[in-house]
Amino acid sequence: MTSDDRIKLEPIWKEALRDEFEQPYMAQLREFLRQEHAAGKEIYPPGPLIFNALNSTPLNNVKVVILGQDPYHGPNQAHGLCFSVQPGVPTPPSLVNIYKELKRDLNIDIPNHGCLQSWADQGVLLLNTTLTVERANAASHAGKGWQHFTDRIIQVVSEHQPHLVFLLWGAHAQSKQKLVDATKHLVLTSVHPSPLSAYKGFLGNGHFGRANKYLEQNGIEPIDWRLPVL
């Protein structure tokens, strides 16, 4: 992971984050990942998809930011977009609750899959704060350096343009609120959509409709939260 041409990273993101690739923490993170691979550990998502959130949603296209924590750690799940899984994989419980809220809020039919790629393509930055994980070992790469990189991503997005929507669900996502200029953006918070907490305030939060209303009020095309049938 360097800022040279070996890294597939969308050009505007690459320029905006160039200095981060030269930071000492990034060298340490590269070495950690190298050692994990050398030890035969299976790392998710696959290398080409680590930066999928950035490549799918160029900086100039960002309208909404949804923060997750770390990638799913089961086979064929993670593909670099938070809360999303690859087509053909069962929809995870938190995403089931996201779909329930979409149905309640906007009467959107619950899709038959868990792939949120169409949201990313429209300008929803689906960013995990840790971008890799070891198979079957949740949060195994937390604290290894990714948090510095993704904190900078959040800051860059906040600084880059006004009138974005940040959806911060759960304590971990809300801990990043300090990185966002709330005078320029709409910040919406609630409990996490996990089955452990969704019924304590996630279901009924109205975030998707409120996000679109804010975008429209500021002359920005809203998100079509409907997902295509796969």
From Swiss-Prot:
Top enzyme class: hydrolase
GO terms of molecular function: uracil DNA N-glycosylase activity
The protein's role, per its UniProt record: Excises uracil residues from the DNA which can arise as a result of misincorporation of dUMP residues by DNA polymerase or due to deamination of cytosine.
Keywords: Cytoplasm, DNA damage, DNA repair, Hydrolase
Record keyword Hydrolase present: yes
Location in the cell: Cytoplasm
PROSITE patterns found in the cross-reference section: U_DNA_GLYCOSYLASE
Name this polypeptide is given: Uracil-DNA glycosylase
E.C. no: 3.2.2.27
GO terms of biological process kind: base-excision repair, AP site formation via deaminated base removal
Active-site residues, Swiss-Prot/TrEMBL: 70
Keyword Repeat: no
Gene Ontology cellular component list: cytoplasm
Reactions performed catalytically: Hydrolyzes single-stranded DNA or mismatched double-stranded DNA and polynucleotides, releasing free uracil
Similarity field: Belongs to the uracil-DNA glycosylase (UDG) superfamily. UNG family.
Pfam families: UDG
